[in-house]
């Protein structure tokens, strides 16, 4: 069964991070520039949460706030479930589905952030794994 470390090996473990006092407007510009849907928010260079496109929609647009005078720290999501590189892809899918979230922070044994995985990463890995199984079964059937 595939684990998060397989996802991180494929896509890399680099994360895009901003300090908590960064304006939401600058966070959005960074997300657009990097073509990503979430950004890690830090305080004193330590992880404190994520800002996502959903946070922007719910906490800025729907609340009538302005992205140029609101900080990332004002709208972060801080209570996300944590996973490790050894967490299974199936478990990540379950956590994301049950929590209705699209991103999970990955922490190592020293509680250091070592990556972010998205629902797209999980779906890609699941499809790739199923394709491998189908190819193996196909080879087995044609070998007999």
Task: Identify the role of each PLM range.
Residues 31-34, 39-55, 96, 104-120:
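A glycine-centered beta-loop-beta connector
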Residues 78-79, 102-113, 140-144:
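Short flexible/disordered coil segments
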Residues 1-13, 52-82, 88-97, 119-144:
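Tandem CBS (Bateman) regulatory domains
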